[in-house]
């Protein structure tokens, strides 16, 4: 039995969110194949820690036992991670960024020790992540920004194995109901869920 943690981050209402909808469908397909796995879903919009932003005023206390350590210990206790994120102003939502700020802690999730100068080692190398992203613009429209690449790079930095990402793009340029759009991605979702 594997333990799976799912992070939903869209500030869009659940019934209107593409990233949440596609992540939910992915989890449903995954559960069909892995019925014994334990799945925990966290909506970061209603998660206290993800409301806390790192500032100069709280830097000394931000990475604390009740917040950072608890989240890191949870990540160390699970086998797989599913992260759903829309693009908000060319980046991930603030709630997800706040969560990531809490877990990126030197000598806990990454380290510069025991590596060549200028290199690092990720300490979450037991984990595998499935990234599911959505954005209003088609892929490649904005070369200066890719929230998918940002997440892939960050999780790679932490030593996490990255499954091929699922990118739902162009949702505002060629608007379709999410249920209709899902039909275009259904086989990809089923395939990637079976391989995850």
From Swiss-Prot:
Binds 1 FMN per subunit. This is FMN-dependent NADH:quinone oxidoreductase. Its cofactor is FMN. It catalyses: 2 a quinone + NADH + H(+) = 2 a 1,4-benzosemiquinone + NAD(+); N,N-dimethyl-1,4-phenylenediamine + anthranilate + 2 NAD(+) = 2-(4-dimethylaminophenyl)diazenylbenzoate + 2 NADH + 2 H(+). Quinone reductase that provides resistance to thiol-specific stress caused by electrophilic quinones. Its EC number is 1.6.5.-, 1.7.1.17. Belongs to the azoreductase type 1 family. Transmembrane segments: none annotated. Pfam families: Flavodoxin_2. InterPro entries: Flavodoxin_fold, Flavoprotein-like_sf, FMN-dep_NADH:Q_OxRdtase_AzoR1, NADH:quinone_OxRdtase_FMN_depd. It is an enzyme of class 1 (oxidoreductase). It comes from Metamycoplasma arthritidis (strain 158L3-1) (Mycoplasma arthritidis). Keywords: Flavoprotein, FMN, NAD, Oxidoreductase. Homodimer. The gene is azoR. NCBIfam families: PRK01355.1. SUPFAM superfamilies: Flavoproteins (SSF52218). FMN binds at residues 10, 17-19.
